[in-house]
A protein has these predicted regions:
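Active-site Tyr-X1-5-Lys
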Residues: 3, 20, 40-73, 92-102
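Short beta-loop-alpha junction of Rossmann-like oxidoreductase domains
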Residues: 21-22, 78-81
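Conserved cofactor-binding/catalytic machinery of classical short-chain dehydrogenase/reductase
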Residues: 8, 51-52, 120-123
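C-terminal substrate-binding subdomain of Rossmann-fold SDR/epimerase-dehydratase oxidoreductases
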Residues: 99-188
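Conserved sequence/active-site signature of Rossmann-fold short-chain dehydrogenase/reductase
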Residues: 17-18, 68, 75-77, 124
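Structural signature of the Rossmann-like NAD(P)-dependent dehydrogenase/reductase core
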Residues: 9-11, 68-74, 108, 117, ...
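Short-chain dehydrogenase/reductase
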Residues: 31, 37, 41-53, 83-91, ...
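Conserved Rossmann-fold NAD(P)-dependent oxidoreductase catalytic core, especially the SDR/UDP-sugar
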Residues: 1-44, 68
């Protein structure tokens, strides 16, 4: 991009780059932009996002190429994958509820007390546009501050469906205990 004369670039990062130790309490995750260091993401994906942010910021410092970085928090919406194990939690939950027989059971990984926030894709696109048009350089969270436990989310989907279903918590990957977007910086 630099060699081609690009003046501004956008990088889509992820909340997965935040340190695992800041996300152990499901009721009080610490995901402000300033809490990223000391670095300790819980996965290789998180490390890749963190290293890529550093790379883009170095281009800003060394080559004056403007960079805008959004740390996405659980974006969902139409046209999102909803089958095959690669779907986001909202789509997976909706699929499980839709496929369950009325009076049946859906399985939720872990104890269901882990928390997340979810942002609809249209709101995400608006945030990207505003960020790219701004003068702000540096990573910024793009997500909702409305946190919900996975069990409560499952109950909400069940209620909307009109079905009577039981939630069965099972062993399975759960990720960090809590993740929620701290939007103080983006509000400035």
């Amino acid at each position: 991009a630099h060699l081609a004369g690009v003046k501004k670039i956008f990088y889509s990062s992820s909340a997965c780059m935040y340190p695992e130790y800041n996300q152990l309490d499901p009721d009080n995750p610490k995901c402000s932009e300033a809490s990223a260091y000391p670095a300790a993401p819980d996965s290789e994906y998180g490390w890749e996002k963190l290293f890529s942010e550093r790379l883009y910021l170095s281009y800003y410092r060394n080559h004056k190429m403007e960079v805008r970085i959004a740390r996405f928090h659980n974006i969902f919406g139409v046209q999102g994958t909803w089958r095959g194990g690669k779907e986001k939690a909202p789509a997976a939950m909706c699929r499980k509820v839709a496929e369950a027989e009325d009076g049946g059971v859906i399985e939720v990984w872990g104890d269901g007390k882990q928390t997340r926030s979810f942002l609809y894709v249209d709101e995400c696109v608006d945030a990207i546009r505003r960020l790219v048009e701004s003068d702000f350089t540096g990573p910024v969270n793009v997500g909702s501050e409305e946190m919900i436990s996975i069990n409560d989310f499952a109950k909400m989907v069940i209620d909307i469906s009109g079905k009577k279903l039981t939630i069965k918590n099972i062993k399975g990957p759960t990720g960090v205990r809590g993740r929620n977007s701290d939007n103080n910086l983006i509000k400035e």
